[in-house]
Amino acid sequence: MGLKLWVKQRRSLPFIIGTIAIALFTDLFLYGIITPILPFSLVDRVGISPDRVQSVISTLLAVYAVANIAASSPIGFLADKFLTRKVPMLIGLIFLTSATALLTFGNSVPMLIVARVLQGLSAAVVWTVGLALLVDVVGADNVGSTMGGIFGFISLGEIIAPVFGGIVYESLGYYASFGVCFIILLLDIALRFLMIEPREMKNDSTLQDVERTSILQRQDTQDHELKPKRSGLFSSLCLPIYSLLHHKQIFGPFWTSFVNSCLFSAFDATIPLELKTLFDFNSLQCGLMFGVLSTPYFFCGAWAGAMVDRRGSRTIGKRAYAILGCTLFLLCIPRTNTSLNIYLFSAFLAINGVVLAFTSSPGFVQSSHYVAEYELEHPTFFGHNGPYTQLFSAYNIVYSLGMIIGPLVAGFLRDQFNFITSIACLSLLCFSASLMANSCFTDRLDSE
């Protein structure tokens, strides 16, 4: 009885959602812990000259994204070949553990690059397969509030990681900063092994009935649809979801995701150096400022996602991006090293954090609803495993492109011109996302 109860808990919706949330949290934590440390460790530990730090940081951010892009389509293809989504999730842990070890003990730029490549491979797995599993278990109608809540929770990784990294680096040194990483990894490993996803419940009679019904429904329409046969290699590189890129309900969310990625990665590349230059901050203070940016995300994420579920994506998306395009310029006001300007910069970061919380859910909700409706009309189009792995695989590629372009462009503009020029470029991207949301997204009333 006790064993059956434990199995029941392991396959429960809260346990699965919690496992996915911890996996995403771990990915962000291990990605973010080094953000406030790099400007200092590259000089003190690796021996990089100060004038090369910006370019090396941008490179490390970019190679992470390149690895993510290279892996996303093959992972999206291969993940659907496994009987469960759990297997690729476990494979991702191998990449993540190896990356963490290299970041901990690596003392050269090539070793750090390899570590970031492995992190990119791990992220491609967890963000593609994990989010697909999430939509599998909660359904498209609840994806906004669920993702909003998860994004709010995993923003703790973005909050805690830089702060923790800065505190421990300042007080105990480089190696101690990564000790907690392995503890979190152990928790992540345990949860991924313990989780029982719906696909593993093959012996459950109810599930068999559902599968039998689903197969019959698909077979009824299969004869009416002709799909080109693809070789395995071609399928892995050209998933069916890509043929929908000309649909505005897909292209629009992809563009807003690209903009979000540019914003976050540009912040990672420029804000620590701007704080160091403008206010003479150390790694701890830089980490605390990232906490100021991310904390509003934690408190507003679920609320913003629930609003999108209830009202739709267009109004919230277009307004959030338009407001963000304006509030970014607040960061340009403090230009001298005074206590007042430090407080102002903190307040302006918090304001932008609140607005950012309202930009994450609209695109995900819009595209998830659209592919769900498209699959109802074309049941065999995405294959027997449905659209979500493919959708989030494509999202990974788009987001990773932003992670390449964002830090490189923002870092270049800051080096060649100034921080204000970088912010102006990011603001233009936000306004373009607002226009895209207005023309490509829909509200609930529009679809009724």
From Swiss-Prot:
- Its main localization is endoplasmic reticulum
Q: Which domain of life is it from?
A: Eukaryota
Report the locations given in the UniProt record.
Endoplasmic reticulum; Membrane
Per the record, its GO cellular-component terms are: endoplasmic reticulum; membrane
- Annotated membrane topology: Multi-pass membrane protein
Keywords carried by this UniProt record: Endoplasmic reticulum, Membrane, Transmembrane, Transmembrane helix, Transport
Pfam families reported in the protein's UniProt record: MFS_1
Looking up InterPro entries in the UniProt record yields: MFS (IPR011701), MFS_dom (IPR020846), MFS_trans_sf (IPR036259), MFS_Vesicular_Transporter (IPR050930)
Family the UniProt entry places it in = Belongs to the major facilitator superfamily. TCR/Tet family.
Q: What is this protein called?
A: Uncharacterized MFS-type transporter C18.02
The organism of origin for this protein: Schizosaccharomyces pombe (strain 972 / ATCC 24843)
